[in-house]
């Protein structure tokens, strides 16, 4: 729509002579001409130090520049009128959409009163109420707040970027962990399948060997039976003929007695062994293989269960709790017994009468495992001697199983002497009971002064080892009979499960298990009154 002549005339009146656009924030200079505020700042002095008016060339002072509020309002109204002329009926103006209007004068808000903290239009700014106040352009007043908002926004954006980066890294870590778990799952399945395959192959191999032995025994049995039946038949025929000959009259018997006896010379009849020596040897070797299999599987099961269920921990001894009868190594992992009390100063945490010592590390949860090595000359030799005795007994049993030979057991003078010395041996065993050691766990609050029983009711769960045997330190003591004397005692503590399990760390044989409800901190416990013996914590 074409602009009308009156409106065009008004537009010319409110047009800046410098920028040829509507007067923006109009101001008047000393000569009375009106320009945009921003245009006056761009005016440069032609001669001298004062700028001159672009129209009349008269100099003016910038400090004398004054705003023309009414003209600014007129410019707004012209712009609004121009827009409204092209607006459809009922359509909301852009100013009404984008800007708030003064509630009093319905004019656009341009200024901000710093004294009252209110937004002002041109009319409000020139009113008696706000004229003495400091009023600045709304954009200028908003600039510091906008900068604060932008600074805060920048901080928030950095925080957002950090969170997004943290989330991305966390997601990547989780995905990597899940991938690792999947790989470990496949590894577990593959390893167990390989183990199953190996065990199946070994099982089939052993069963094949067993089947061959069964076949050899069965064939030997048939030969043994057949040979025995043949010998019995031959003997029956001879017996029958001799019985008939014995019933003959004397005259008939004496006619050919010599010839008859010569036909049946006296000979040894066959007495064979039911099992061939080679087969018997193979059977014994197979029994040894089964023992090795049993021992190997037991060690494997014990080690696997220990490694998967329990955490192996490295423990040390607490020197402040060590009795004066004990001597600790520099690394606090080895203890020896001395018959002389060496402690000059009795620490409050020290055992005074009992030769005991506690571990420096305690446990209040979880499943943990450590070992105690018993180092003593001859500690493992008794076991080997026992094996030799068992082998000798087996040889004697084989000799007794022979055919046609036998022997009687006669008591010797040495046996009588040994029977007479039983009382002396019993007295020596009673003395050996005093020379022993204990390994186990104890509450960190266990009593340490005076003579102690060191039993579960006192907060100690331990085994007692000596050259004469092994006992669980219960009330009363329970003697134990493990297959092998342990050179290393494994101690497995399940705090929540309430168990302390002792095993032979080398053969994985279960020795004893204490059950209890633990409520206090538990620490390793050693007790040693055995000259020539050392206890070492492993690892």
UniProtKB/Swiss-Prot annotation:
<dbReference type="InterPro" id="IPR050143">
    <property type="entry name" value="TRIM/RBCC"/>
</dbReference>
<dbReference type="GO" id="GO:0070979">
    <property type="term" value="P:protein K11-linked ubiquitination"/>
</dbReference>
<dbReference type="InterPro" id="IPR003879">
    <property type="entry name" value="Butyrophylin_SPRY"/>
</dbReference>
<keyword id="KW-0808">Transferase</keyword>
<feature type="binding site">
    <location>
        <position position="102"/>
    </location>
    <ligand>
        <name>Zn(2+)</name>
    </ligand>
</feature>
<feature type="zinc finger region" description="B box-type">
    <location>
        <begin position="97"/>
        <end position="138"/>
    </location>
</feature>
<feature type="domain" description="B30.2/SPRY">
    <location>
        <begin position="295"/>
        <end position="539"/>
    </location>
</feature>
<dbReference type="GO" id="GO:0061630">
    <property type="term" value="F:ubiquitin protein ligase activity"/>
</dbReference>
<feature type="zinc finger region" description="RING-type">
    <location>
        <begin position="16"/>
        <end position="57"/>
    </location>
</feature>
<dbReference type="InterPro" id="IPR003877">
    <property type="entry name" value="SPRY_dom"/>
</dbReference>
<dbReference type="GO" id="GO:0045087">
    <property type="term" value="P:innate immune response"/>
</dbReference>
<dbReference type="GO" id="GO:0043161">
    <property type="term" value="P:proteasome-mediated ubiquitin-dependent protein catabolic process"/>
</dbReference>
<dbReference type="GO" id="GO:1901224">
    <property type="term" value="P:positive regulation of non-canonical NF-kappaB signal transduction"/>
</dbReference>
<feature type="binding site">
    <location>
        <position position="130"/>
    </location>
    <ligand>
        <name>Zn(2+)</name>
    </ligand>
</feature>
<dbReference type="Pfam" id="PF13765">
    <property type="entry name" value="PRY"/>
</dbReference>
<dbReference type="InterPro" id="IPR001870">
    <property type="entry name" value="B30.2/SPRY"/>
</dbReference>
<feature type="binding site">
    <location>
        <position position="124"/>
    </location>
    <ligand>
        <name>Zn(2+)</name>
    </ligand>
</feature>
<comment type="subunit">
    <text>Interacts with TBK1; this interaction bridges together TBK1 and NEMO in order to activate TBK1. Interacts with INCA1.</text>
</comment>
<comment type="similarity">
    <text>Belongs to the TRIM/RBCC family.</text>
</comment>
<dbReference type="GO" id="GO:0051091">
    <property type="term" value="P:positive regulation of DNA-binding transcription factor activity"/>
</dbReference>
<dbReference type="GO" id="GO:0008270">
    <property type="term" value="F:zinc ion binding"/>
</dbReference>
<dbReference type="InterPro" id="IPR006574">
    <property type="entry name" value="PRY"/>
</dbReference>
<keyword id="KW-0832">Ubl conjugation</keyword>
<dbReference type="GO" id="GO:0046597">
    <property type="term" value="P:host-mediated suppression of symbiont invasion"/>
</dbReference>
<keyword id="KW-0175">Coiled coil</keyword>
<dbReference type="GO" id="GO:0005737">
    <property type="term" value="C:cytoplasm"/>
</dbReference>
<dbReference type="InterPro" id="IPR013083">
    <property type="entry name" value="Znf_RING/FYVE/PHD"/>
</dbReference>
<dbReference type="Pfam" id="PF15227">
    <property type="entry name" value="zf-C3HC4_4"/>
</dbReference>
<dbReference type="InterPro" id="IPR001841">
    <property type="entry name" value="Znf_RING"/>
</dbReference>
<dbReference type="Pfam" id="PF00643">
    <property type="entry name" value="zf-B_box"/>
</dbReference>
<dbReference type="InterPro" id="IPR013320">
    <property type="entry name" value="ConA-like_dom_sf"/>
</dbReference>
<dbReference type="GO" id="GO:0005829">
    <property type="term" value="C:cytosol"/>
</dbReference>
<protein>
    <recommendedName>
        <fullName>Tripartite motif-containing protein 26</fullName>
        <ecNumber>2.3.2.27</ecNumber>
    </recommendedName>
</protein>
<comment type="function">
    <text>(Microbial infection) Promotes herpes simplex virus type 2/HHV-2 infection in vaginal epithelial cells by decreasing the nuclear localization of IRF3, the primary mediator of type I interferon activation.</text>
</comment>
<keyword id="KW-0391">Immunity</keyword>
<dbReference type="InterPro" id="IPR043136">
    <property type="entry name" value="B30.2/SPRY_sf"/>
</dbReference>
<feature type="coiled-coil region">
    <location>
        <begin position="188"/>
        <end position="227"/>
    </location>
</feature>
<dbReference type="Pfam" id="PF00622">
    <property type="entry name" value="SPRY"/>
</dbReference>
<dbReference type="GO" id="GO:0044790">
    <property type="term" value="P:suppression of viral release by host"/>
</dbReference>
<keyword id="KW-0963">Cytoplasm</keyword>
<comment type="function">
    <text>E3 ubiquitin-protein ligase which regulates the IFN-beta production and antiviral response downstream of various DNA-encoded pattern-recognition receptors (PRRs). Also plays a central role in determining the response to different forms of oxidative stress by controlling levels of DNA glycosylases NEIL1, NEIL3 and NTH1 that are involved in repair of damaged DNA. Promotes nuclear IRF3 ubiquitination and proteasomal degradation. Bridges together TBK1 and NEMO during the innate response to viral infection leading to the activation of TBK1.</text>
</comment>
<dbReference type="GO" id="GO:0005634">
    <property type="term" value="C:nucleus"/>
</dbReference>
